[in-house]
């Protein structure tokens, strides 16, 4: 096989001695052979034994198990990543379902809050506003030259934790770890970036150890000019890169996506990735119930950019199943802190305005006040699907869920807020309140629920089912943009991988340990959609499949040969 040949072919490198051991992408530690130790001036710098990567991974896993709390485990794994990336990904490869909650949600949230306290070693780029005239130089300073995927944040809306300043860097680092572990994208091609535009978090500003720019956040024209400078510099340095916007605040997320999605190959995972994985889950859940999404009525708690992004994808799918635009929009109800979005509410954001319900259609509703509450919507609209993206814990109350179950024998309830401390309701409660009838998917990981004689698996509606496959599909196909059709293709591919939808039993979403296969399936459909839309060169399916395999990196050591600079 071509990949086997690639892994056996030697890599020619100019580094030697302690410098080589300090290079995470190239360091093998105790796995350097005797020949390599001689050629690269490593004799005496390592213990005598020459180990395999399997032996190294076994030792690392034993050390990992010695840590009792998740935060310490996260720090330990990050240390391995900053020391020997190949070993880090071999360890993840062997224990992905166990370690994913440690390297990403929910543990990464705590790591972001304490970023300056637990900081060990530089990774990625920190681009601060005071240095805005030197962005080109900063990109040249990146240790990776052939960058193909960037995840960038400004740290303002980190999970459900709000403004963390440069602490938000934990999210791009974690996200790119999953691009590699789940989607096979070589870590040599990835770059995490934080745009340090200050912070409005008084805890960070008053923390003597805070490592970011100690200044209130810039906003308005200054902010957008800074982002523009960054984007143009990226285009000059890596014109074909895939750029993922991550954890930008609501007032910036959608405008930035709309501004740049037709200029560069980019997407916003909070808006589009969340929408894609949720839509894929809902298509699968509808199939499992013997229906289509067009037959469902959907209520959202949370009408921010993420919730509205999901709603628009649901509407697009309903239209593809035969509903008109008006019919589809009439089936989607958006509730925020001021109640149901209607055409009488003032000061709606642009992306919210298309998702309002017409007041004339609500005249027969029985409500408690002029502001139509979530409970009012459940009583009157009688939804079959309830989705939480509010970031506020406990808002899916027992009264609410029982009311929903009165008119819906098999309610689909998705409390998607992250981290776990922000979830709208716990799966165990939802299942108990519906006498075991509810189909539950969450944003953070939860253990299976024991109900009577059943063990009910809880699907984690995690973006990691989607974005690694999108990234792999973009790289393999050479796509120049990420379009709505490509995202829709990703959702449908995920639905095809659902055990519950295909077999009639099991979990709603595939096991996390099967996610590499899922990513390849998604990559194929994303690549085909890119070709159909003229965003990639048209090839045969066989050629696209080979390109996906060729781009799928595996954590194996290659032999090294020495060369000069």
Curated annotation (Swiss-Prot):
Q: What is its EC number?
A: 1.1.1.38
> What GO terms fall under cellular component here?
cytosol
Record keywords, A-Z:
Metal-binding, NAD, Oxidoreductase
Residues that coordinate or bind a divalent metal cation: 246-247, 270
Q: Using the record, list the residue span of the signal peptide; answer none if the entry has no such feature.
A: none
The reaction(s) annotated as catalysed by this protein in its Swiss-Prot or TrEMBL entry are:
(S)-malate + NAD(+) = pyruvate + CO2 + NADH; oxaloacetate + H(+) = pyruvate + CO2
Named from the GO MF annotations, one term is: oxaloacetate decarboxylase activity
Q: Which cofactor does it need?
A: Mg(2+); Mn(2+)
Query: What does the cofactor field's note say?
Result: Divalent metal cations. Prefers magnesium or manganese.
**Which processes are annotated in GO (biological process)?**
malate metabolic process
Q: Which NCBIfam families match?
A: PRK13529.1
Please give the name of this protein.
NAD-dependent malic enzyme
Which species? Serratia proteamaculans (strain 568)
Q: Which gene encodes it?
A: maeA
């Amino acid at each position: 096989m071509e990949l086997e040949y690639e892994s056996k072919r030697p890599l020619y490198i100019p580094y030697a001695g302690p410098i080589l051991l300090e290079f995470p992408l190239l360091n093998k530690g105790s796995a350097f052979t005797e020949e390599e130790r001689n050629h690269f001036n490593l004799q005496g710098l390592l213990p005598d034994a020459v180990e395999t990567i399997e032996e190294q991974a076994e030792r690392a896993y034993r050390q990992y198990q010695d840590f009792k709390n998740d935060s310490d485990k996260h720090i330990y794994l990050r240390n391995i990543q900053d020391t020997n990336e190949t070993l880090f990904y071999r360890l993840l490869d062997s224990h992905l379902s166990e370690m994913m909650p440690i390297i990403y949600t929910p543990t990464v949230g705590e790591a972001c809050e304490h970023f300056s306290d637990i900081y060990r070693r530089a990774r990625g780029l920190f681009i601060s506003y005071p240095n805005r005239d030197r962005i080109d130089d900063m990109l040249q300073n990146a240790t990776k030259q052939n960058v193909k995927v960037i995840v960038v944040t400004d740290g303002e809306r980190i999970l459900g934790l709000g403004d963390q300043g440069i602490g938000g860097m934990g999210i791009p680092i974690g996200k790119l770890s999953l691009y590699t572990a789940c989607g096979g994208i070589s870590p040599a091609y990835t770059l995490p970036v934080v745009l340090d535009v200050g912070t409005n978090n008084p805890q960070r500003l008053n923390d003597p150890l805070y490592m970011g720019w100690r200044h209130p956040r810039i906003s308005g024209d200054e902010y957008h000019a800074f982002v523009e400078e960054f984007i143009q510099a990226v285009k000059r340095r890596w014109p074909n890169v895939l750029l993922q916007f991550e954890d930008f605040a609501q007032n910036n997320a959608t405008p930035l996506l709309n501004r740049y999605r037709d200029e560069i190959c980019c997407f916003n995972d909070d808006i589009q990735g969340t929408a894609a994985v949720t839509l894929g889950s809902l298509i699968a859940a509808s199939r499992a119930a013997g229906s289509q999404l067009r037959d469902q009525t959907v209520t959202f708690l949370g009408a921010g950019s993420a919730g509205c992004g999901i709603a628009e994808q649901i509407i697009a799918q309903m239209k593809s199943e035969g509903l008109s635009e008006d019919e589809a929009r009439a089936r989607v109800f958006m509730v925020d802190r001021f109640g149901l979005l209607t055409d009488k509410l003032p000061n709606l954001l642009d992306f919210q305005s298309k998702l309002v319900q017409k007041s004339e259609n609500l005249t027969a509703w029985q409500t408690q006040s002029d502001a139509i509450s979530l409970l009012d919507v459940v009583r009157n609209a009688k939804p079959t699907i309830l989705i939480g993206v509010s970031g506020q814990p406990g808002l899916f109350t027992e009264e609410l869920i029982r009311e929903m179950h009165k008119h819906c024998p098999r309610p689909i309830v998705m409390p998607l807020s992250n981290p776990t401390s922000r979830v709208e309701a716990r799966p165990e409660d939802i299942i108990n309140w519906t006498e075991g009838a509810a189909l539950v998917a969450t944003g953070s990981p939860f253990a299976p629920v024991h109900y009577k004689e059943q063990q009910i698996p809880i699907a984690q509606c995690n973006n990691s089912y989607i974005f690694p496959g999108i990234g792999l599909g973009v790289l393999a196909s050479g796509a120049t943009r990420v379009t709505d059709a490509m995202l829709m293709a990703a959702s449908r591919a995920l639905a095809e991988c659902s055990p519950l939808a295909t077999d009639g039993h099991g979990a709603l979403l595939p096991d996390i340990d099967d996610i590499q296969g899922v990513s390849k399936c998604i990559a194929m459909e994303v690549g085909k959609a890119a070709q159909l839309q003229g965003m990639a060169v048209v090839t045969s399916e066989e050629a696209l499949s080979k390109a996906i395999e060729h781009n799928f990196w595996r954590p194996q050591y290659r032999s090294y040969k020495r060369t000069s600079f």
